[in-house]
Amino acid sequence: PERKITRSKDNILYELDGEPALGLYKKYLGDHVQDLPTQCFYFPLYYQTKDMKKGIVRTILGVDEKTGSMTFAGDLEEGSTARLMKTNIDNLVSGAEDAAKACLSAGASSPGLAIIMSCVGRKIIMKQRVEEEIEVVEEIFGPQTHLTGFYSYGEIAPSKNTLDPTIHLHNQTISITTFAEI
């Protein structure tokens, strides 16, 4: 369910719906709670401010048992909404496909070059299947598009499929920039 960020400072989340954030995560994760923060990439936070048309994902960087707080890879504004997430590989591959299709619908139908920036968190989760996200992008663009890219620790881009030009720092996403001759 959607929750309200009731207490935060910069990138530290103290409370969701008036409850300690870490306690709520522990209830949500059950047996997986011992895996935090080492398995943090599997349990990110979907975050959206009042000004955003579409939310973004925030990765857990650490937890503080003493304060019941959690540190994320990006600021979290009080009064915003949040949703606890669980990642799976098929959704990551599907997200890469959606990103490639969004590029084509936003510009040239046959770009000559695509630069792919994929979060290192995606690589950690996907392990041996990491090539699947590149294969699906290659399939969407076709052989005329040369692909290059790198793994990053944060992707700066507008939110997908929106006309909102505002850029945000994203975590655990794939961002694609294409170039075409006109």
Language-model segments: residues:
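Small-residue-enriched flexible segments
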Residues: 1-127, 131-142, 150-182
